[in-house]
Amino acid sequence: MSFSVQIKHELATNPLIKTEWSSFLAGYFQNGLKLLATGQWSFKTSTATLKALFSNALQFSFQIHETSTHCEFSFRASQTEVDQLLAFDATQSDLPLQKAYVIGAFLSGGSVSDLLHSSNFHLQISTNNELQIKQLMKLFHPFKQTTKRHQLLVYVKSYQAICDFFKLVEAFDGYLAFEENQLQKNFALEQVRKSNLEIANLMRTLKTSTSTAEQLKILINSADFKKQSLNFQRFCLVKLDHPDWSLEQIAQFFERKYKVQITRSGIQHLNAKLKKLNQN
């Protein structure tokens, strides 16, 4: 089951549909209702949940024709009843009716990309009813309007806008699944970023250590090295053997190995002298 079908299944079971049935029906019919040559009205559903919904709640006498891809309902109703639904303006209604209308519009012509397995954020409602397009633009301000393959549609392509739409139509299961998936993706990306940063820092450290070691070897093998103080010579040899030691560890080693007590500032002085000689 695709993520889009999951969302439609959740919306089709929303209690608002039953309590605000006329508004929902207007949202659905303004999108896909057709007048047949027989004088009957016809609309299609694409999921078993929608088929069950209309089979149980549709108040008109109807027939069902099923294919491998959809289920087509045909029914008879007075022109007045149908005109009222097709002319319904949800923007003049209260919030529950507006939500039911948008749910109907989405169930009729809406789709959403596979937000759980793709980075492509896209939600749209397609319809050739200009009245419906205008209403949807007013009812959900982030919507943008375009035409694709001679079909009018409204759409959003941002993570936040899709989350807001799910909250508007009360698709809370879909919203939470989408939100959790994004948190997991963001966490994974953050871990990769941290790992890359740690690797970069390690490479810089290794490069610096290698450079320092080469400089130390050159200094130790030079004639000037033997002219330096004994403590400085010892310091250089310790730095060569233990490049990762802190100044405090070197001071402790001096006391343990050479029985020489040297302060931290003394070690810092030797380290500064080494840097100065390397620069020269």
Swiss-Prot record:
Known DNA-binding region: 246-279
One GO MF term: DNA binding
Record InterPro entries: Homing_endonucl, Sporulation_regulator_WhiA, Sporulation_regulator_WhiA_C, WhiA_LAGLIDADG_dom
Family, per entry: Belongs to the WhiA family.
Stored PANTHER family: CELL DIVISION PROTEIN WHIA-RELATED
Function: Involved in cell division and chromosome segregation.
Protein name per the record: Probable cell division protein WhiA
Organism whose genome encodes this protein: Mycoplasma pneumoniae (strain ATCC 29342 / M129 / Subtype 1) (Mycoplasmoides pneumoniae)
GN (gene name): whiA
